[in-house]
C-alpha cells in the first residue's frame, strides 16, 4: 500500500494548500495534466480529486487498520478468561475468552504480547499459539458450539482480528504450547502446570484497562496457588485490568507445600515445589526468607500489600533457572535441589533481589515501565538503577539479614568489580547505553553472530557498582546523616506514594534519570551532575577508592594468579571436550594470531588441552613467549603462534585500611547493619 499512502499524503498537502487560501501555487501545477486547466477549473478539479482520494484512503484505512491503532471504547468490554489443561502430557494450555460487546463494533483485535514485564527482550509469545477460533455468542467449550464461526484474519505476527458485525458477544479459544519452567515462560506436563501470564493470555486491543475475570479448571487433585490466592481451593479471580492479571504467576500441582509467616501485620507465604531432594532444609529456608523480609522492610517501611507469595521451584536440572518480580509475588526457579548448599545460597540471593523489586521497579520505576506497550520492547535508560541498584541491595540485604558476614559480602563486591573491570565492553558501553541495549542483552536469542562480548556490559553489575560508589560517597559527604537508602526512600515517596495516578495501571508517573540525579544531589548536599555524566552516561571507572575510604576500606589490584594470561580469549560456557572460543578481544594477541570465534583449541604448546586445563597450559609460558596453538576450524586443522603480552586479567580485592579511623569504622557499621538515619 505504499502508493496509496503516498496519494493520501499528496491529498493532505493539496488540502492544506487550499485551506491556506493559495490561488494557483499548488505542488502539482507542473504536471502536464494540471496545466490544461484554468485557475477556477483547477480549483474544482482539486476538490473532486481530494474527495475521491480521501474516500480511497478511508477504505484503505478500514481494510488495513493496524491493530494498535484501535481506540479504547468509552464503555469497557466484559472479558472473562478460562484456563484448562485437559491433556497435561501434550504441554498444551487451553484458553477460552468470553467477550461481551456493549456497543456494536466491526471487529475485535486480540493480541499476544511480544515480551513480558520483568524481562526486556522480545520473546514473541505468539509463536506458541495454535488453533485460534472464534464464534458468535457466549459458548464454552467452543468445540461443542452450534453458533456460527466468526471470520478471522491474522493481521500480523501477534494479532488476530475477529469480524463481529451483527453480534453483541463472542467466544474465542486457542491453545498455547508451554514446556519451559521459567519465570518468563510456561510449563505444562504430567507433574504440574506453571505459567507467566504474558506467555498465556491474549488481550483485547484497546481494552487492556478493562476489568477481567479468570477461572482455572485444573486436572483432578491439582491445587492452584498464586500471589492473589485468598482462600483454599480458590479457582476464580477478578482483576482490575489485564496488566495485573498477567502480573500474577501461578503454580498448579498436586504436591506443592506452603509455609507462612507475618511481619508487621503483613502475611507472607513460601510455596515450594521440588523435583529433587530437600534434605530437610525447607524450615530453614522459610526462616531465612523471613530474615530477608525483615531487613528489606526495615529500610523501606511497610509494603502496601496485605499478602505476598514466594513461588519457589527446585528444578533438579541444569537447564531451568530464573527469577521474576511481580506486584504481590515473585517466582524463583532454581536448577538443582534444595539440599545442595550452593543451590540454597543461590535461592536466598535471588529471593533478596526479587523481593527488593517490590519497591524498586514494581512501584518506583523508570517512566517507561508501566503501563506497557506489548508490541515493542519497553526501552528505558534507567535499568542500571532499576536492576543494577537492586543487585547491590540484594547482596547488602543478605549482609543486613545476617546471612552473609562482612568478609563474604565484600568478597562478592570485589568479584563484581573484577568482572566489570576485566570486561572489554565496560570501556565502550555506559550504564545508560547498556539499559537501552537490554533487548539484546536480556537473554534475547539470535542466530546472527555478534561482537557483544567485546562491546557490551550488563546493566546489572554496572549499576551495582555505581550504587556501591554512590552510597559510600553520600555517607561520607553527609557524615553518615544520609545514604543511598535515603535517596531510594525519597524517590519512592515522590514518584510513587505522593505522585498522582498517571494511568490505569498503578499510581505514580515513574521517574527519569534526571529526576534521580536531582534527588541524589539534594540528599548528598552537592551537585552530582558530574558523577552521573562521567560514570552513568560515560564510561569512566567509578572512584572506588575515594568511596571505600569513607568506610575504612581500599581496593587493591593485582594480576590474576589463576589466569594472568588469556591472550584475549573467552571460551564458550557449554561443556565441550575441547575448549571452544566464544570471542576474541579486540586488539589482543589472539586476534593478531588470526584466531576466530568458533575455533576449537586442540593444543597449546604441543600439549592437548581441555576446558579445565587450557589456562594452566597457557600460564606455563612467560610474558613475551611465542606460544604454538593448534585449532580446528571448519574441519581444518590450523597452527598459529600467539605472543603473550602483559597480563590481561586482574583480580580486585576490597581490604581493610590499616589507618582506618574510628569515624570510618562507625560509618561502615551503619552501612553494613542498616542503621537508618
Q: Language-model segments: what does each one mean?
A:
Residues 85-86, 118-189:
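A surface-exposed beta-strand-loop module
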Residues 95-101, 112, 156-190, 212-220, ...:
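Short, hydrophobic/aromatic-enriched beta-strand segments in well-ordered soluble domains
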Residues 97, 257-383:
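Juxtacatalytic substrate-recognition/specificity segment
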Residues 125-128, 200, 209-229, 240-244, ...:
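Zn2+-dependent metallopeptidase catalytic core
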Residues 394, 404-677:
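C-terminal recognition in membrane/secretory proteostasis and scaffolding
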Residues 93-126, 199-219:
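Surface-exposed beta-strand/loop patches in extracellular or lumenal glycoproteins
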Residues 173-253:
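Extended, low-hydrophobicity, Ser/Thr/Pro/Gly-biased non-transmembrane segments
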Amino acid at each position: 500500500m505504499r502508493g496509496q499512502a503516498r496519494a493520501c499524503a499528496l491529498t493532505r498537502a493539496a488540502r492544506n494548500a487550499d485551506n491556506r487560501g493559495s490561488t494557483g501555487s499548488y505542488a502539482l501545477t507542473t504536471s502536464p495534466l494540471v496545466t490544461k486547466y484554468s485557475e477556477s477549473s483547477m480549483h474544482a478539479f482539486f476538490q473532486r480529486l481530494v474527495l475521491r482520494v480521501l474516500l480511497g484512503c478511508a477504505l484503505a484505512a478500514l481494510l488495513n487498520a493496524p491493530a494498535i491503532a484501535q481506540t479504547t471504547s468509552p464503555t469497557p468490554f466484559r472479558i472473562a478468561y478460562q484456563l484448562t489443561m485437559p491433556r497435561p502430557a501434550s504441554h498444551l494450555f487451553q484458553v477460552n475468552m468470553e467477550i461481551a460487546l456493549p456497543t456494536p463494533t466491526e471487529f475485535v483485535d486480540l493480541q499476544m504480547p511480544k515480551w513480558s514485564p520483568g524481562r526486556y527482550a522480545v520473546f514473541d509469545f505468539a509463536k506458541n499459539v495454535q488453533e485460534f477460533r472464534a464464534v458468535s455468542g457466549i459458548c464454552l467449550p467452543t468445540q461443542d458450539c452450534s453458533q456460527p464461526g466468526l471470520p478471522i484474519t491474522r493481521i500480523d505476527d501477534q494479532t488476530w482480528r475477529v469480524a463481529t458485525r451483527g453480534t453483541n458477544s463472542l467466544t474465542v479459544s486457542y491453545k498455547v504450547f508451554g514446556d519451559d519452567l521459567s519465570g518468563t515462560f510456561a510449563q505444562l506436563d504430567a507433574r504440574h502446570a506453571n505459567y507467566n501470564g504474558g506467555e498465556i493470555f491474549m488481550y483485547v486491543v484497546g481494552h487492556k484497562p478493562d476489568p477481567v475475570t479468570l477461572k482455572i479448571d485444573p486436572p483432578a487433585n491439582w491445587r492452584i496457588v498464586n500471589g492473589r490466592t485468598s482462600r483454599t481451593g480458590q479457582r476464580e479471580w477478578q482483576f482490575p485490568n489485564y496488566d495485573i492479571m498477567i502480573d500474577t504467576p501461578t503454580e498448579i500441582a498436586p504436591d506443592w507445600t506452603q509455609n507462612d509467616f507475618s511481619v508487621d501485620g503483613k502475611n507472607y507465604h513460601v510455596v515450594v515445589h521440588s523435583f529433587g531432594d530437600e534434605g530437610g532444609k525447607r524450615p530453614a529456608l522459610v526462616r531465612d526468607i523471613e530474615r530477608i523480609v525483615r531487613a528489606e522492610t526495615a529500610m523501606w517501611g511497610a509494603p502496601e500489600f496485605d499478602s505476598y507469595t514466594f513461588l519457589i521451584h527446585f528444578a533438579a536440572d541444569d537447564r531451568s533457572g530464573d527469577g521474576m518480580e511481580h506486584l504481590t509475588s515473585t517466582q524463583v526457579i532454581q536448577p538443582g535441589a534444595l539440599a545442595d548448599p550452593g543451590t540454597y545460597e543461590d535461592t536466598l540471593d535471588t529471593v533478596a533481589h526479587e523481593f527488593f523489586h517490590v519497591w524498586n521497579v514494581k512501584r518506583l520505576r523508570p517512566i517507561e515501565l508501566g503501563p506497557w506497550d506489548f508490541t515493542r520492547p519497553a526501552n528505558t535508560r534507567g535499568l542500571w538503577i532499576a536492576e543494577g541498584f537492586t543487585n547491590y541491595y540484594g547482596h547488602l540485604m543478605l549482609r543486613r539479614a545476617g546471612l552473609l558476614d562482612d568478609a563474604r559480602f565484600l568478597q562478592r563486591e570485589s568479584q563484581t568489580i573484577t568482572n566489570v573491570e576485566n570486561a572489554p565492553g565496560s570501556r565502550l558501553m555506559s550504564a545508560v547505553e547498556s539499559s537501552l541495549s537490554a533487548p539484546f542483552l536480556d537473554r534475547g536469542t539470535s542466530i546472527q553472530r555478534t561482537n557483544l562480548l567485546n562491546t557490551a556490559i550488563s546493566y546489572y553489575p554496572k549499576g551495582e557498582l555505581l550504587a556501591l560508589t554512590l552510597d559510600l560517597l553520600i555517607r561520607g559527604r553527609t557524615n553518615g546523616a544520609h545514604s543511598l537508602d535515603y535517596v531510594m526512600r525519597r524517590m519512592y515517596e515522590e514518584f510513587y506514594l505522593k505522585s498522582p495516578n498517571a494511568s490505569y495501571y498503578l499510581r505514580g508517573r515513574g521517574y527519569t534519570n534526571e529526576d534521580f540525579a536531582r534527588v541524589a544531589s539534594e540528599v548528598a548536599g552537592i551537585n552530582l551532575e558530574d558523577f552521573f555524566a562521567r560514570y552513568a552516561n560515560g564510561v569512566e571507572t567509578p572512584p572506588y577508592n575515594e568511596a571505600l575510604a569513607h568506610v575504612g576500606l581500599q581496593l587493591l589490584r593485582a594480576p590474576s594468579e589463576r589466569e594472568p594470561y588469556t591472550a584475549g580469549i573467552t571460551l564458550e560456557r557449554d561443556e565441550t571436550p575441547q575448549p571452544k572460543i566464544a570471542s576474541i578481544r579486540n586488539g589482543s594477541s589472539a586476534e593478531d594470531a588470526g584466531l576466530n570465534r568458533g575455533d576449537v583449541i586442540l593444543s597449546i604448546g604441543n600439549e592437548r588441552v581441555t576446558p579445565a586445563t587450557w589456562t594452566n597450559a597457557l600460564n606455563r609460558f612467560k610474558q613475551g613467549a611465542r606460544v604454538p596453538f593448534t585449532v580446528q576450524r571448519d574441519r581444518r586443522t590450523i597452527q598459529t603462534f600467539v605472543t603473550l603480552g602483559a597480563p590481561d586479567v586482574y583480580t580486585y580485592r576490597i581490604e581493610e585500611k590499616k589507618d582506618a579511623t574510628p569515624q570510618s569504622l562507625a560509618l561502615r557499621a551503619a552501612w553494613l547493619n542498616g542503621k537508618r538515619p
